[in-house]
Curated annotation (Swiss-Prot):
Residues 77-265 form the BPL/LPL catalytic domain. One of its GO terms (cellular component) is cytoplasm. GO terms for molecular function: lipoyl(octanoyl) transferase activity. The record marks 193 as: Lowers pKa of active site Cys. This is Octanoyltransferase. InterPro entries: aa-tRNA-synth_II/BPL/LPL, BPL_LPL_catalytic, Octanoyltransferase, Octanoyltransferase_CS. It comes from Brucella abortus (strain 2308). The gene is lipB. Keywords: Acyltransferase, Cytoplasm, Transferase. NCBIfam families: lipB, PRK14341.1, PRK14345.1.
Amino acid sequence: MPTGKLRQKPPYAAIMTNSPVTPSTETQQPKRDALYARFLPQEADAPPVEWLIAEGLTDYEEALAFMEARVQATREGTASELVWLVEHPPLYTAGTSANAEDLLTPDRFPVFNTGRGGEYTYHGPGQRVAYVMLDLKRRREDVRAFVASLEQWIIETLAAFNIKGERREDRVGVWVVRPEKPRLADGSMCEDKIAAIGIRLRRWVSFHGIAINVEPDLSHYGGIVPCGISEHGVTSLVDLGLPVTMGDVDVALGKAFESVFGPRQTK
């Protein structure tokens, strides 16, 4: 992995929104640990969230087109909320905060500019991507609390495998402390990113979502500076020594989702 200094990014770096949100200053914002609460529908009789798992590898452009159409339908009230679990062929995506210098090998894999928040990330086989299309008007119109809830969903999923995932206030996503690795130059403990978050809101309906590394080829991250952070690495469940399958992770994701966001409906 590349080494260097962590660039300072705004607290909303993983978010792109077309909704009327006015973030307060950093000193006024509570920490995301304090923000987390169950992100449930306000109506007791709200329909469950549709839960779909795609087979095989999903073309990225097809996924974008599907999300755009589904978000529109959700806004219009003709489609329910949806979580869509996919895997992609190897590719890089650039969020709205991406720095061109962080794309180290542009010819390695296809590169897609996307409207989600965040910087460069990698998607590929062995990584579970969950596209989250929820109507925050039915829940809470609170972007930072929503991000904290997405992080909690990941943290509870990892806990099912006895992995302690952690938040970092200056870095959206979920991190794992690696005490077995050499300490950083400043003496702090090594930390690796195991899950990324990048979302977009369109009139309070979310899309894009989260990505958890199950067993991807971690060397593929070498073509970018992941999320603009060069002093920390990336890891996966299998890299941490867990012989888990994608199916195992999907089961854990489903249970943790219901804990944080409420009922879901599978087909």
